[in-house]
């Protein structure tokens, strides 16, 4: 299989977040809520169900402290995730706070697009530099069948508006499923031919609540990869702060294709990201442990040195790879709880 070159990208600070396997971490995925208003059949088919005990999500000041600590340790990119992060009433304040943190160069947002048409201008003003939005189908009825919401046309208008106000590229996520997404591949290719969209197909991942759905719908991204390579698409080099997608481009297309294939051998070798949940727990892997509590060190600015020390110490416990290939998805019942 064709290998992907990785660009040697310099940084202003040398990251101190380096694990036992010499992987460097410059990318934080920060969940600010686990609430989601969609009912996607691959994630929350029965909708969001609040826990019996009340949860207090990270406050703006706690978010400021955790992002500052990561930035001080070399993190350059923060992705704000959920659940659906834009459901928080203080989302714009959070985005602005993250964007104003010294050392943070990119503030990305992962969203279901529910409020994109209405609020995209405000997101940009708050400091959101990059957007990933989910579009699992370009067919209105199919989209509603997958997500439980009749919002496709509004989301597409939101994407168009993003280009109008100066976003140079939008990343669009679709979960790769035999019955739903795979038959629409040609339609997606037509859509991105003249639009600077990176269309990212994410392999369906097995989680505790979705075993039977996974067995029925899982499709390897390699099948898509081989087809694209045969049609003249070419793999592109990756920058240090890039996510896990293998990106392909074609001279006849303005858009790109990204493939996220967690079951592929060596998927974890280039891991560059850590996760903090909306409840203030550090997760070293999407499919991993219960999480390491950080919240007791987020109350005061004077705790930053202790917080950074805990982050560095915890990182040494990060495993070399996940165990998805043997059916072990860790404790993860669904991906909404930590933002994927």
UniProtKB/Swiss-Prot annotation:
Cofactor(s) the record lists: [4Fe-4S] cluster
Q: What residue ranges are annotated as transmembrane?
A: none
Known role? Catalyzes the cyclization of GTP to (8S)-3',8-cyclo-7,8-dihydroguanosine 5'-triphosphate.
Note whether Lyase occurs among the keywords. yes
Residues that hold [4Fe-4S] cluster 1 according to the record? 36, 40, 43
E.C. numbers: 4.1.99.22
- Enumerate the NCBIfam families for this protein: moaA (TIGR02666)
Can you say what this protein is called?
A: GTP 3',8-cyclase
What is the primary gene name for this protein? moaA
What pathway or pathways are given for this protein in its record? Cofactor biosynthesis; molybdopterin biosynthesis
Q: Name one Pfam family in it.
A: Radical_SAM
Return the HAMAP family for the record: MoaA_B
Q: Please list the residues that bind GTP.
A: 29, 79, 110, 171, 273-275
Keywords in alphabetical order, please. Answer: 4Fe-4S, GTP-binding, Iron, Iron-sulfur, Lyase, Metal-binding, Molybdenum cofactor biosynthesis, Nucleotide-binding, S-adenosyl-L-methionine
One biological process term from GO is:
Mo-molybdopterin cofactor biosynthetic process
| Species annotation | Actinobacillus pleuropneumoniae serotype 3 (strain JL03)
GO MF = 4 iron, 4 sulfur cluster binding; cyclic pyranopterin monophosphate synthase activity; GTP 3',8'-cyclase activity; GTP binding; metal ion binding; S-adenosyl-L-methionine binding
Q: Which domain of life is it from?
A: Bacteria
- Free-text cofactor note: Binds 2 [4Fe-4S] clusters. Binds 1 [4Fe-4S] cluster coordinated with 3 cysteines and an exchangeable S-adenosyl-L-methionine and 1 [4Fe-4S] cluster coordinated with 3 cysteines and the GTP-derived substrate.
User: What region holds the Radical SAM core domain?
Assistant: 20-246
